[in-house]
Curated annotation (Swiss-Prot):
Its main location: periplasm. This is Cytochrome c-552. Its EC number is 1.7.2.2. Heme c 4 binds at residues 277, 280-281, 388. Heme c 2 binds at residues 159, 162-163, 296. It comes from Shewanella sp. (strain ANA-3). The lineage of its organism: Bacteria, Pseudomonadati, Pseudomonadota, Gammaproteobacteria, Alteromonadales.
Amino acid sequence: MQHGDEMMKKMTGKSFALSALVAASFMAAGAMASDKTEPRNEVYKDKFANQYNSWHDTAKSEEITDALAGDPSLVILWAGYGFAKDYNAPRGHMYAVTDVRNTLRTGAPANAEDGPMPMACWSCKSPDVPRLIEEQGEEGYFKGKWAKGGPEVVNTIGCSDCHEKGTPKLRISRPFAERAMETIGTPFDKASKKDKQSMVCGQCHVEYYFEKKDDRKGFVKFPWDSGTTVEQMEAYYDAIEFSDWTHALSKTPMLKAQHPGYETWKLGVHGKNDVSCVDCHMPKVTNDKGRKYTDHKVGNPFDRFDETCATCHSQSKEFLEGITKERYAKVKELKARAEGQLVKAHFEAAKAWEVGATEAEMKPILTDIRHAQWRWDFAIASHGVAAHAPEEALRILGTAVDKAADARVKLAQLLAKKGVTDAVAIPDISTKAKAQAALGMDMDKMNAEKEAFKKDVLPKWDEEAKKREATYK
């Protein structure tokens, strides 16, 4: 006992607090995973076999599509931000944790206090997130760097993200999402079953940002205080003078849209007619014993046409697919026009700074660029918008083109005033590698650091998680 007292005295206050925290967490874990959340999806594979097996089939979307390689302009549009390093098309829920670990955007942290990203980057990736919030509170969960959560957030998006523990009953598992629904006058506990089916998806398939206020630094918040349209959120961000980053070329205080699928779905024909996300992406199907269940392989409705589209539409699959492809082509065309204007605007703004433009002269120009790119990003980041709300997508992209053009007209006038009358040269950005090189990005170094991280750090995270989960009852 005396020896123990001496050891205690030698421990610093910081190390003692850390030891106490670890001990407390293991004591809690020894009781059960969490009172409200069982993060281990495999626990439910027998009780809810059909749902579990179909959920597991989301692993079949194993192909990785490099969005930057497919559209190198994105590198320039996101210059100075993590997405210029690496951005792949989204895959199935089974890959949520894997992909956020592997992306260059999360860096190659050497320890829990290292790396470029905050803890909030885990927030939509795993049922371990609500578990941690229940154990630590939001203040404890959001505090610190992304790497802090590495050994804790290991179970991919699954059962407890959307369901109450051990039951099919739907729930919102993130307090920040619950607050957001209340903000727009649709509290989850008062919603219909049909609305709840979309609201659980709206925990993550939404626009959000990380707060910068001292008392809530790094907290996730949905910018819905003034409404959920692109203009209302833009006005909200402007009012609080928020920006995600400063553009490396134009020095514009930029906004990065996330994936506002819920907001755009609400504005489309399906949302307005009470057709939920589940109706189209998780339909009722019949197993080999003739029993119906909800298919949890979230995917393209056309892959299960008879159980999805055909329950409402009398037209053929070929007809509806044709219409959707036409709409997608129109959205893609306007998207490209907006990108072309924005890329030139960023380079022209960089030139204006170079030849002596003042902040006062640049402010209205940067506002136009900020608003144009926000609107472009909002439309394209809303995956499936060509099916959900094509008219809204085209409207938003049209305003993006207009605002980018406005910025370029002002830039032409300002550049002429500064003596620049020739067109501003745009470097070769025809490939992802050339675009990244034009920005001076050392991709070899970033990739090497990431590979070392995957080799040296990830196995340690998994081993720590395995030991912790072994104490669960």
